[in-house]
Amino acid sequence: MSINVFWFLPTHGDGHYLGSSEGARAVDYSYLQQIAQAADRLGFGGVLIPTGRSCEDSWLVAASLIPVTQRLKFLVALRPGIISPTLAARQAATLDRLSNGRALFNLVTGGDPEELAAEGLHLNHTERYEASAEFTHVWRKVLEGETVDFAGKHIQVKGAKLLFPPVQHPRPPLYFGGSSAAAQDLAAEQVELYLTWGETPEQVKEKIEEVRAKAAAKGRTVRFGIRLHVIVRETTEEAWRAANRLIANLDDKTIADAQQAFARFDSVGQQRMAALHGGKKDNLEISPNLWAGVGLVRGGAGTALVGDGPTVAQRIQEYADLGIDTFVFSGYPHLEEAYRVSELLFPHLDLATTELPTQRPATQPQGEVVANIYVPQKVSQS
């Protein structure tokens, strides 16, 4: 089975060491452009752009990189409860049109109540998933060309519609990750690809089976993806030295402070990530070649595959055998590691070819919208 491999744009910072200013790098637009163009040239299918108050805005970053890339797809965040689904659908269609079908969307419910409150979202975990389900229903229908009336507990719209459709038909794919039962229910019912953070193959297998069964009960099928860091070198010994060097400047206080901050999250996925290492720097290899050191101070994806190219490829195949077809990778620093992954790992993988959609007629020349209501149609000649 061919696999899709994405890279990552570090809009929240980059460097040679975790939790330290030593070896840090200025992450400005020129640097992000370098990474995006490298990923484009090296054969990555797309890039994940992170979201949250610690990051640059993912939509603006993606839009700015469209003209300087050719085939690279952009996986950007949808934030239910922070933006209306109708506006989000219009923005999604615009990004898809501007990029000629290179837009992908990642539904992010959020897991930090403190950050969400700062955004104006004051819902508990259960309510956020209720709102996310309603948001996604409206967003999908509007993008698919329907005129939507919807009266839910959290979302109410009347006459929501889209005048300018996306390039991808019926709409761009929707990605989503979450480990709670509510998250799995949402994935089974409404998304195209369910993402998991890099847990052990046994844990990932269990999650896939649960989501697959829930989707089947609704008459649907769901694709699967995984989010991991990668530390690949010419030898496995060298790769492990690089992993240990990445956390060489971490002290116990920095780790404890980070884990205390993560403890306030109500994200089940973040809790599962934290349980893999317990806040300790010893015994970080939690499964063969799967290292939990990144999660000592980094929220979200906290594990890395470590080894030489053939070894890492073997571990990737183990996940692929579970049904995963999309791998979202990253590494520190992200520019150099993109090249290492391409040179040392890609030769051992069966990579999917990036296919771009042909332009739909709706993206061709048209007259100005009449009274902000409809697009004038070409009159047929009799």
Swiss-Prot record:
SUPFAM superfamilies noted in UniProt: Bacterial luciferase-like (SSF51679)
Catalytic reaction(s) noted: an alkanesulfonate + FMNH2 + O2 = an aldehyde + FMN + sulfite + H2O + 2 H(+)
Enzyme type, top EC level: oxidoreductase
Superkingdom as given in the UniProt entry: Bacteria
Transmembrane segments: none
Keywords, alphabetical: Flavoprotein, FMN, Monooxygenase, Oxidoreductase
Record keyword NAD present: no
GO biological process, one term: alkanesulfonate catabolic process
Enzyme Commission (EC) number: 1.14.14.5
GO molecular function: alkanesulfonate monooxygenase activity
CDD domains for this protein: Alkanesulfonate_monoxygenase
Record-linked Pfam families: Bac_luciferase (PF00296)
Further comment found in the protein's record: FMNH(2) which is absolutely required for this enzymatic reaction, is provided by SsuE.
Job of this protein: Catalyzes the desulfonation of aliphatic sulfonates.
Similarity comment: family membership: Belongs to the SsuD family.
Oligomer status and interactors: Homotetramer.
PANTHER family: ALKANESULFONATE MONOOXYGENASE, ALKANESULFONATE MONOOXYGENASE-RELATED
Name of protein: Alkanesulfonate monooxygenase
